[in-house]
Amino acid sequence: MAKEELIEMDGVVTDVLPDSRFKVQLDNGHEVMAYSAGKMKKHRIRIMVGDRVDMEMTPYDLTKARITYRHKVGGPPGPVTGGGNRPPPRQPRRR
């Protein structure tokens, strides 16, 4: 199947199921079964109920989809990067 044949849709995750599967409500009101793409699993991108996602669907089976992107939504900030409780660098001695 060529990539040009895929249908791209947006939706909201309504239910989290076992084995990286999700129920997603499309913008047009239909509900489909979706799974997260391999790159999302590889980079450990977590998908929660209420997340807005982009999906790819094949025209042959419109009840299944692959989640390709999770939209960033406002929420608590992520972990602070940069060293944590590291002391400041030492200054060289003056002679």
Curated annotation (Swiss-Prot):
Gene3D superfamilies: Nucleic acid-binding proteins. It holds the Pfam family eIF-1a. One of its GO terms (cellular component) is cytosol. Residues 86-95 have a biased composition (Pro residues). Keywords: Cytoplasm, Initiation factor, Protein biosynthesis, RNA-binding, rRNA-binding. Residues 70-95 are annotated as: Disordered. One of its GO terms (molecular function) is ribosome binding. Residues 1-72 form the S1-like domain. Component of the 30S ribosomal translation pre-initiation complex which assembles on the 30S ribosome in the order IF-2 and IF-3, IF-1 and N-formylmethionyl-tRNA(fMet); mRNA recruitment can occur at any time during PIC assembly. One of the essential components for the initiation of protein synthesis. Stabilizes the binding of IF-2 and IF-3 on the 30S subunit to which N-formylmethionyl-tRNA(fMet) subsequently binds. Helps modulate mRNA selection, yielding the 30S pre-initiation complex (PIC). Upon addition of the 50S ribosomal subunit IF-1, IF-2 and IF-3 are released leaving the mature 70S translation initiation complex. This is Translation initiation factor IF-1. It comes from Rhodospirillum rubrum (strain ATCC 11170 / ATH 1.1.1 / DSM 467 / LMG 4362 / NCIMB 8255 / S1). The lineage of its organism: Bacteria, Pseudomonadati, Pseudomonadota, Alphaproteobacteria, Rhodospirillales.
